[in-house]
């Protein structure tokens, strides 16, 4: 029956391109924010199969069985029920769920207006119903609903992926969100494709590999992407419901994924992979909130504080092939006693100690406890909770952070590369970057950043400035020398980086002809500065600029 569903959605042209044609940019943007009403207004009265499916599965609106039969002629409404994707509802439930306004007249009935002397012909009163001929002792015949109302039990929507190996159009099933149900999320809720998911999808390295692992697979979208460039894909999740949805989505999209239930790396003990991706349930949640509001499996791994991230980082190397990569999103606590700008990395650094990996760690944002709690409690439909329950959960969360001495929570990502035996003997190398302004890194940016940690000897390297790098100079009026120099990156990470005049000179001369050592010697001679002093000034900034893609070798 899944094959029939697939055939029908393809035949109905229910694709992202069709959604672009059916909906305005504003309505599409609203859907990305989980706001369905603009789309429902624009699709009202549109009979196209794609419009029906969008209203039903994405907009959460009831539809008549006949409309679903027309949109899915092979599977039909009955097939949706058999698959567990939809259910029949009565007229009252449908009426309460429909959001489009009903026709309403505030004028008096025609007969009353005529009696009031408005010159209209009076209507005849309605005749009473005819008496029944049924025997009073006879059981009444059950009412037959010819065209019942149906409601979706899951979110199903098209998703397009443009990848190095080609373009793909998929259909992805997940649990309905609070915007569709009007209720807080259930403990076992399986998320669809949200903002964090898209971030990880975009930053994943898409090189062809033999094996890939998705830890905490949720609805399975990461695994679908991995299957386009990995010969073998394994997906794991502690949630049985998530595993079932991943299996369903794999079948719907004719993709082979080995789905296993279990926590983190337990289901793949003894196996290794060339690429591991994970958007783990990292939200720092106190036991008091779990007891009062339940444990939302999609965001809460059940561990104390931010120890889930430590568990992933410490367990990953045993499941990585030499040269293999891990990419993950993460949160970490920064104590109030530490400076969040200069000491944020200490906790992550401790987790990485002794591991046979190189690491690139980026903190993209920080939130104070109140903003962190507000974000995550709203994410699960908190405002739809009973007010007293909402406020108790909110305050319990804040009290927990206060007792733990948490100043802010860092949010970012970690990329690891597994070292071979020879590399591991000299220890792993790490780079910590704070707040990468500009563009979110793509897969090739991550791959380059990790590779740059093991680049050639700097002074003997011939560097080439990226073609999109430009320099901005700020002068005090009348001064011959610039007060501020900023390098701008048009592509790549899109960063803007203040630099010294010496760094600017080295970057400017890096045209693929001379080594860095030769350029430094020339800069030292031109500026009458000792070469060792120039080296000391430019070494760290040049390594950063290489990692960020301003310079290549």
Q: What name fits each language-model region?
A:
Residues 238-239, 304-363:
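Conserved Class I SAM-dependent methyltransferase catalytic core
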Residues 240, 280-311:
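Mobile active-site "lid"/loop adjacent to the S-adenosyl-L-methionine
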Residues 1-52, 91, 147-152, 157, ...:
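Acidic, low-complexity/disordered tracts enriched in E/D and polar residues
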Residues 331-338, 364-380:
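Conserved catalytic loop of SAM-dependent methyltransferase domains
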Residues 49-103, 125, 129, 133-135, ...:
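Long, charge-rich, low-complexity alpha-helical segments
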Residues 186, 194-278:
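Conserved SAM/SAH cofactor-binding pocket of Class I
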Residues 369-452:
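Flexible, glycine-/basic-rich loop-and-beta segments that form/coincide
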Residues 93-112, 118-212, 217-225, 229:
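SAM-dependent Rossmann-like transferase core, predominantly class I methyltransferases
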